[in-house]
Amino acid sequence: MKKISVVTATRAEYGILKPLIRRLLACEQWETQVIVTGTHLEAAFGNTVQEIEGDDVPIYRRIPILNTENDASGVDDAYAVTLTMAAALRGFGAYFREEQPDLLIILGDRTEMLAIAAAAMNAQIPIAHLHGGELTQGAVDDCVRHALTKMSYLHFASAEVYRERIVQMGEDPSRVYNVGALGVENIMNEKLMTPQELAASADFPADQPYAVVTFHPVTLEQGTCPQQEAAVRQMHELLDAMRARPDLFFLITKANSDAGGRQINELLEGETADEPNMKLVASLGMKRYLSAVKHAQFVLGNSSSGIIEAPALGVPTVNIGDRQQGRIMAKSVIGCEPERSAMIAAMDQALRLSERIRVDRQLRERLRVENPYGDGHTSEKIMAVLEQYMKLDRIDLKKKFYDLPDLQHQ
């Protein structure tokens, strides 16, 4: 029987992949191997492997890769990220050598995925990549994402403009599909919690006005060296802006493991402990997170969930800085600089928009319809393509560069 491997390394990634993983596991045409790695296996990031176990997803293998070596420059500087990539190359190289899956499914733009894809490429294992063609000009993710595109054989884009961009990079249009975003599918199909259920589960006052906050380090912030200093400085600005709104409660999820992430989390642990209107959690899990966003006044930070999931729920987003610059953004996304006064003004604007959405049903529905990331049937569309390709005796990995028609004779 043929084998498909699907890799998840972070809480956000697993939440997005969940509907696809369910369909993969239910398919009897092949064996699905779920490989868990990265921050899932680390206590500092909430041991989010427990969420996967709680969903009764069979974990085929756990491959620890995250560097926890503490040195004078911090545990998550650029060198530590490099060490994590090296561990991923070694660990997944051994896995691919042993198992030889017929297809590897990866999502997004994280550096560990670059190493995992390189190991698969060396083992001549075809790669199916989700969320290629996107832009996040404030992060190193752009370079990683585009490299993953060139290493992959099948491409599942979340919007038409991203599908076109993948083709623009020389990928054969017959292997590039606009399927929408799995995050939108989660919203449409997951039974989310009521405010009362959420308050009991997450232990915060969900019945009063609140915002959901996630702020990750910006890995390509110009003129910032080291990156940790920029991350901490911007987080201080955000904390000061939140303190200016004592009438709001702030539910804060920890930053990711990018360079500067641990410094942000350490700052949050120290600064929020005595704040009556702030609660810090390592991870909410997909269902609680989406439930929290659904009932929030707005989403605050620089996470892609504010660009994809929040608009699909009809919730405004205050998008801080340029980490998500280049993505398609709904009209409910309000951009601002990572400075206290700009953040306060953007929060005020988001609150006004939130009130308009609350009382104007037509506006609420219009904002949801204008969400550019698909119709909620993404996993079904991906499965249809996979079933077609998995019937082939073999996949020819030799790829011809596709020149755009209007450039071929210039």
Language-model regions, residue ranges each:
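Nucleotide-activated sugar donor-binding and catalytic core shared by glycosyltransferases
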Residues: 1-410
